[in-house]
């Protein structure tokens, strides 16, 4: 849902640049949101092949866009702003707690891919290929994006007199309509690949699989698309605290037990060895019907404990406890 909102913003701002009167139309953003949601669902119904083609097209552009924004900010501001020279406002235990909250929220953002990364790595040419791609691409890409975001936001304070952290708003302020429209449309396309790959593809596969063949992948996509609307991203994005501390930390806390069970099962019980054929055999050792009498009670125990930890963490303003504790405890129970 969050990526749908961001992508819809790209479309909406691009239309406003081309047609300034667009903002006067009632429910203009709602129209942009529904159109972008429909486009995302249609792309996802085409499967992994379509995602790979679109990702190959948009990923290089994101790197170029980051560099352009960085150069533009530095040239127009004449410096990197106050970010580098400004003294720290927090330290000690408070700094540690805030860092752990940010780390937990970041892990929560990646939680869906942690659980379903095999839906993508199975397309890798080799084990070595996906290990190198993940080890090199993720740290460099994620760190680079964070650094550019911080530096450009700092430059915006000098240029506009206020900190503009939203890259869409910042891009719209560049005095070049053609560049702005082209950039926003590319960003919208990139959001589709990011959203579907990280948050939608794997759950849709799960819905189709759990249905026992009664639902096709395309039908699962439409079901998941409707469910995404129920998260009401337009409300989540009204506050960074609501999005980061509440949504990401809570979702990460509920997904952590699943990751804990998977990790423990693979390392400690299976000793990193799996029977691949049995994984896809409906009557094999991994068949849910054979394990359901054990899964059901333990699933309830894990989720009740995880839910309590999440709520207590938020109530006590110790958000970082929510997911890390849930994951560690689930690994013990498994």
Predicted segments, located by residue:
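Hydrophobic alpha-helical segments and their helix-loop junctions in multi-pass secondary transporters
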Residues: 4-17, 61-87, 109, 149-158, ...
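TM-loop-TM module centered on a large, flexible mid-protein loop between adjacent transmembrane helices
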Residues: 144, 148-195, 213, 229-241, ...
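C-terminal membrane-solvent junction of multi-pass transporters and transport-like membrane proteins
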Residues: 258-334
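Hydrophobic transmembrane alpha-helices that form the core helical bundles
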Residues: 1-21, 191-208
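Membrane-interface loop-to-helix entry segments
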Residues: 31-76, 134-138, 248-256
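Hydrophobic, membrane-embedded alpha-helices of multi-pass small-molecule transporters
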Residues: 36, 70-76, 88-152, 176-197, ...
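Membrane-water interface regions at transmembrane-helix termini and the short interhelical loops
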Residues: 13-19, 35-58, 73-74, 116-126, ...
């Amino acid at each position: 849902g969050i990526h749908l909102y961001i992508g819809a913003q790209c479309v909406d701002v691009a239309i406003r640049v081309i047609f300034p009167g667009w903002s006067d139309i009632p429910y203009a953003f709602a129209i942009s949101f529904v159109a972008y949601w429909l486009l995302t669902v249609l792309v996802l119904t085409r499967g992994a092949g379509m995602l790979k083609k679109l990702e190959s097209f948009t990923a290089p552009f994101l790197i170029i866009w980051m560099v352009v924004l960085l150069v533009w900010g530095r040239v127009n501001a004449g410096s990197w702003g106050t970010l580098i020279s400004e003294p720290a406002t927090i330290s000690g235990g408070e700094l540690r707690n805030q860092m752990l909250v940010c780390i937990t929220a970041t892990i929560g953002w990646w939680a869906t891919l942690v659980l379903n990364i095999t839906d993508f790595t199975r397309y890798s040419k080799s084990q070595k290929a996906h290990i190198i791609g993940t080890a090199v691409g993720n740290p460099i890409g994620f760190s680079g994006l964070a650094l550019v975001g911080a530096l450009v936001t700092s430059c915006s304070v000098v240029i506009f007199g206020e900190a503009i952290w939203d890259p869409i708003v910042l891009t719209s302020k560049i005095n070049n309509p053609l560049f702005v429209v082209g950039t926003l449309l590319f960003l919208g396309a990139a959001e589709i690949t990011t959203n579907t790959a990280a948050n939608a593809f794997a759950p849709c596969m799960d819905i189709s699989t759990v249905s026992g063949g009664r639902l096709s992948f395309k039908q699962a996509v439409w079901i998941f698309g409707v469910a995404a609307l129920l998260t009401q991203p337009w409300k989540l994005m009204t506050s960074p605290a609501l999005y980061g501390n509440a949504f990401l930390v809570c979702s990460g806390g509920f997904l952590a037990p699943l990751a804990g069970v998977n990790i423990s099962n693979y390392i400690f019980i299976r000793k990193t060895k799996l029977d691949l054929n049995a994984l896809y055999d409906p009557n094999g050792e991994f068949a849910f019907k054979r394990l359901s009498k054990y899964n059901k009670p333990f699933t309830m125990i894990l989720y009740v404990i995880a839910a309590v930890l999440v709520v207590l963490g938020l109530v006590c303003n110790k958000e970082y406890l929510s997911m890390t504790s849930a994951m560690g405890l689930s690994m013990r129970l498994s």
